[in-house]
Amino acid sequence: REKAWSAFLNEKELFETMLLGNSKKLREAEKKEAAASGNGGEPDWEALLQEAQDEGEVQNQNQFYIDEKAYKRLEPHLEKKKGINSDAYKGYQSGPEFDDLRCFLQTCQDLGIEPMLVIVPVNGYYYDYTGFPKEAREKYYEKIRKIAEEYGVKVADLSDQEYTKYFFEDRVHLGKKGWVMVDESLYEFYK
């Protein structure tokens, strides 16, 4: 637990530093992260993924491969959720969030900030259960890719992880395995 807490504090410091844009502090935080990895360089992403996999196999024994606490909160409502979204053929094709994203990316361009978008998938097991069409989800991911392309920004596209066991904490939020993949993408982007 001490190792996990130390890694969390190092990561917290790294993200605070990135948000503040202080490159000296960023380099110091990266050195701490590398030292915490035990290999004197990059974090051992394969080992971190394996650790997340091992923990998931022990802790997430349900049909959606999510955290047991989240599953227990969801379980009483499962019967009424089955197939409920089968008519969601348009998915998330419209909404003010896409304009918000464009506004954010335009602001980044105006200020000379180089962002990276992370396309976080939804839990494919759960979304299939509710009948939310895979094609609608794919259109949603594609729309984000196109917006990123319009603004020439990099994308960490994790949309192919919808069916990765132990990737999610609950129906849509990242779990341990998901965070390892996001962390690796961010590490590579800011390296």
Predicted segment positions?
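Short basic/hydrophobic patches in alpha-helices and adjacent helix-turn junctions
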Residues: C103, T107-D110, K146-I147, E188
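Secreted/periplasmic serine-hydrolase-like ester/acetyl group-modifying domain
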Residues: R1-Q109
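Active-site segments of SGNH/GDSL-like serine hydrolases
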Residues: L105-F132
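A sequence-level detector of short, solvent-exposed, charge-rich linear segments
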Residues: K24-R27, A34, V120, Y127, ...
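Short coil-to-beta-strand
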Residues: Y71-P76, G112-M116, V153-A156
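Generic detector of short, locally flexible boundary/turn motifs and exposed helical patches
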Residues: E79-I84, I119-V122, R145
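Functionally constrained cores in energy, signaling, and assembly domains
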Residues: D100, C108, P115-M116, D183, ...
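Long, positively charged, glycine-interspersed low-complexity recognition regions
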Residues: Y127-K191
